[in-house]
Amino acid sequence: MSGNTLITNLTISYKPSIILDYSAVRDTMFLKIDRVADSLECIYTGMKLPLPDGQDPTEYVYLDGQPNGINTEHTWPQGLGATGSAQSDMHHLYPSRVKTNSDRGNFPFGNIPDAQTEIWYYKNTERTSVPTNFKDAYSEGIRGTNGKFEPRESVKGNIARSLFYFYTMYKAQADAADPTFFQQMKSDICQWHYDDPVDRKEWERNQKIAHYQGGKENPFVLDCSLISRAYCNNIDQACEALTSIVQNEVEENALVIFPNPGHGTFFIRLHANNDIAYIVDIKNMLGQTIFLQGYNVKNGENIVEIDINDHLSGFYIITLKDISSNISNRTLYLKY
């Protein structure tokens, strides 16, 4: 599946019907999604501010709007279609340094030649000359009629996948506001998606957000091939990105799947501390269940064989649910 057919199906399967109101969504994002070790980090500059327990999250880090406070960045600007439910969809929202967020404004994202960059942003600093050290850690901006913003290298893929998500889920209102905005960015953000693949932090953030949005994830984080098939026409390059994520997921869950990747027949190794019943639920990247079966496993190590040879190549989400405790483990399987 590719092109408009894929885009339509992704919208049907992943567009959230449950969205928090804007006040609640900011507090939730700061406190529940992005706070790490009691601090928040700006998506663009890496600047961090403390966020202790017992405070109003949004107000505490805002610092009354000072340049080095933190507020909410809409990667798809509010003035260009991020209104209504889209305004509060956390899959395209991030904490940002107030001044950097303001400078980015409604400018499109894109690569900027160093010689043309007017402002370089790093942590709580700004400069007008090309940095001599750690240049990739800086975001860059151009103002004026031809304004543009380039995020730091380590988050370019995150930004790209947020933009593809927004344009897929809210295309009508995005195009109504400015039919050229996405097209201006498309070539660069396709490349960013390939150059900066999903890492564990982005994967886990996606899962956290889904918890507050009716279980709806950003599918472009789940399956790296979707952006290729829907927008970028470079599937071979894109699809190598998630292999390490798949392996890491398996190692951390007491759930081992092998061989993975594979051709459709694979095995689940389960270690049970007592006799127990499990359900294995396998979904494709459109959220459709393609396999659902219960298993009674014995105390000790168990091996279960699964066959999905009749299904298309791509990523599949495998959920293993302990019926007695209602605890689930989940991982990805890549079928060649």
Model region roles, listed by residue range:
Residues 1-48:
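N-terminal module-boundary/linker segments of secreted carbohydrate-active enzymes
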Residues 60-71, 76-242:
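Domain-level detector of nuclease and nuclease-like folds
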Residues 234-258, 273:
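Residue-level detector of functionally pivotal "anchor" positions at catalytic/ligand-binding pockets or at interdomain
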Residues 261-267:
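Short coil/turn motif common to extracellular beta-sandwich-like domains
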Residues 264, 276, 300, 312-315:
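A glycine-anchored, Pro-Gly-centered beta-turn/N-cap motif
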Residues 283-290, 316:
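Short, glycine-anchored, charge-dense loop/turn motifs used at functional sites
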Residues 291-298:
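Solvent-exposed serine/threonine-rich low-complexity stretches and specific carbohydrate-binding patches
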Residues 297, 305, 309, 313-336:
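C-terminal tail/sorting-segment detector
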